[in-house]
Amino acid sequence: MIETVPESFFKTRLRGQFHKARVSQPRTRPKRIARQFLCLISVVAMLLLPYSAGTALGKTAPGTRSNKTAARRGSEPKPERLAHAVTIYRDIYGVPHIYGPNDASCVFGYAYAQAQDNFKQVEDSYIHALGRAAEVDGPKALPSDLLNRALEITRLSQEEYQRTTGRIREICDAFAAGLNYYLAHNPEVHPRLITRFEPWYLFAFNRYALYQLFIFGKAGIKDNEIKPASEYKDIAAQIGSNMWAISPQKSADGHAMLLINPHQPFFGPGQWYEGHLHSDEGWDMSGASFFGSPFPTIGHNQYLGWSHTVNEPDIIDLYAEKFDKASDPLAYRYGDGYREATKWTETVKIKTGSGVETKTYAFKKTHHGPVVAERAGEQLTVRLAMLEEGGQLDEWYAMSKSKSMAEFKAAMSKVAIPMFNAMYADRDGNIFYVYNGAVPKRSTKFDWSKPVDGSNPETEWQGYHSFDELPQVTNPPSGFVQNCNSTPFLTTTEGNPDKSKFPPYMVGEGDTPRAQISRRILAKENKFTYEEWAKDAFDTHILQAERDIPALSVDFDKLKQQDPARARKLEPAVADLKGWDMVSSIDSKPMTLYALWFERFGQLKGAGDKDPLLRMKALEQVINDLQRDFGTWKVAWGEVNRLERRDTLGDQAFSDNAESLPTAGGPGWLGVVFNFYTRPQKGEKRRYGVAGHSFVSVIDFGPQVQARSILVFGETADPSSPHYFDQAKLYAQEQFKPAWFALPDIKAHLERAYRPGEETHTMAAGH
C-alpha cells in the first residue's frame, strides 16, 4: 500500500522549488539553483505515482549482505597485502600522511584513517548516498531517500562501476577494502546499518554529494540554521566560500600563492577531513575531502594546487510532458508520435518507534528524467547535467596527478564535474580561474526560465559547452584572481572575461560583499609576504558596516528631531557605532551591536514592518535583548560569538555550560573574509558556529611547496582524543598549523606511525 503525503507537507517545502513553473517573464539571467531546488528533497513525494497491487516490488535495498547486484564484486584487492604495504604517519596534530607503493594502497590507507577518525560520519554519508537514511533516522529522512531513488543513484552508480576500468576501478576497490578492513579489525565498532562497503558506493557518494548536498541541499547547511537576515539579504548568495590566488608579481618572495577557504558546515556530511597521500608512483596529494571521498579534492601536490567554490551554472531544466494517450498511460508525446515512459518501484525501509516499516513507491521517468510534479495537466520532469554520465572521480583524480597548468586544464576539460568554480596556482608562477560547469547548449528559441515543451525535439540539449567556452582568467595583468561565490566577470581588476561573449543562461551569480572586500585586499599595491597572506585569510574588516552605519546615523538625526527623549536613550549606542573602526575582534563591543542589529533590521524589514525609522527600532530591540541576557548592551563579540564542538552529525544541542571558545569571525553577508555563521538556540544566551571557515589552507609555491592549514575543530571526532578540539584553539586565535609535506618534516613532527590493523604496535619514527 502506498502512503500519500499530506498537501501541507508540500506547502511548507515547495518554496521556490518549481519557480520555473510559475514565472511569466523571460529571465535575463539564470535563477539561482539554491532558490529553485533548495528543498526538492522534500518534493520528491510528488514522484510517488499510483501503485497497483499487481506491480512487482522494487529493487533490494543496497548495502546489505543479501544484495546480489552485478556490481557488488569487483576485482577486489587482497586487503592484507594492501595493509602491509601502507604506512600511516600521524603528525602531532593527528593528520594522516599515507605512504604506499602505489595509488591504490594509499587510498586503502586513507579509507582506514578516515574510519579511525570518524567512522560514524563516513557511514552516515554512505547511508544517505544509498538512499537508506530513513532506516536509521526515521520519517524525517524519507524525503532525502525518495529523491535519491528518483534520481536512480544506485543504478547509475552500479553501472558506472561496471564500465570503469584501470586506476579508478582500483581506487574504488581499495577504498571499500580499507573501510571493510577497519571493521574487521575493530569489532568493537558497531555500524548503524552498513556492515560491508562495496566499491560502487564511491560513485553513489559522488552523486549524492554533488546532486543532493550541493545542487539540491546547499551543501548540507540546514535552512533553519542560518536564517537571521534571509528576508533582507540573499543568504543563498552569501553562504559559500572564498578562494584567492596571486602571481609572483604580487608576492614578496616571487612565488605564486593560493588561499583555499571553503565555507562548509561544521557538522554532518559537508565537513572536511584533512589528509596526505604519497605514492611511489608519483602521486603526492595533500589537502581535504569530505568523509567518504577516496582522496583530497582540494589542496596541492608538489607542483600545483587548487580550490573550489560553489557556483550556479544553469545545469537543470524542467520539461512539461504530455501523457494523453488513453490506451497507454505510459505513452508521452514526442515529435510526431509517442515515446514510452519507464515505470519502476522502490522499497524503502523506515525506522519507527516500534521497529522498521517497509513501504513501496512507484516512480516514472521519460528520456528527460524523473517525473517530479504535475502542473495544469502536464507532468514535469527534471534533467540534470552529467547525472547519468558520471566521470567526476576520474576528473578529480587527473587534476590531482597534474604536473602543469596545461595538464590541469586538460584534466578539467572533461567537464564531468557539473559545477564549482576552480582556482589554481603553481610553482611556475601561473594563476588561473575558471567558472566550471557542465552547461548544456540550448536553443535560444525557448524561454528556459520556465518548463519547456518536452514533446518538441528542439528543446533537447545540444551537448555541453566545452571547457574553452566557459568564463576563465589566466595570468591576468592585475596579478590576482579571486572568487567568493561571485560572478566570473569581476574575478579581478584587469583581465576579466567579457560578459557579452557568453550566453545569458550560463552564469547565475552577481557580485558579493565577500568578493568586494577580497578585491580590495588583493588590489593593494604592496606585495604579500607569506605571513601577510596567512593573516589576510582571517581578515575581519566589516565591509557592510561602511554602508549601514552612515544610513543609521542619518536616521538617528531624524529621530532627534522627532523624538528627542527616545533619541537620548539610543545616543550612546549610536556613538559607539559611529566611532567603531569597523573591524571585528573578540573584544569588540560595537561588533556585537552591529551584527545583531543587522540581523534584527533584516528580520523586521522582511516581516513587512514599514516603520520609517526601522533602523532605530531594530537598534532599540537589540539593546533590550542584550541588557536582558547580559545585564548590559556593551557586550564583547567573543562573549556572544562562540565555537563549540558537539556530535559529528549535528544532532546534539549547544550549551552555554559546555566548553567553547570566543571567535572574531562573522557571517559572510556582512562582507567579512573570516566567515563564521552561528545559530541562536532557545534557552541559551550565546550563539554557536555551524558553518563558515571550515578548512583553510595557505600555500606558497616556491621550489619546495610550503603550506599551512587549519580545521575548525580537529582531525578526529573522538572526544577522548587530544585531536578532538586542538585545532580549534588555533582557529579561534586566527592562526594556522604547519601542513608538513616532505617526509623528513613529517617524521620530525611525528606522533606515531603504523600499518592499518597494527596501530597498537606503533612503528619507530625512522621507519
Residue ranges with predicted function:
Residues 1-34:
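N-terminal secretory signal peptides that target proteins for export/translocation
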Residues 48-65:
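Signal peptide processing junction and immediate N-terminal pro/mature segment
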Residues 596-668:
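Charged, long alpha-helical assembly modules
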Residues 636-737:
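C-terminal accessory/interaction regions of large nucleic acid-associated machines
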Residues 39-50:
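Bacterial N-terminal signal peptides
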Residues 73-585, 694-767:
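Mature extracytoplasmic enzyme cores
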Residues 586-598:
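Alpha-helical protein-protein interaction/assembly modules
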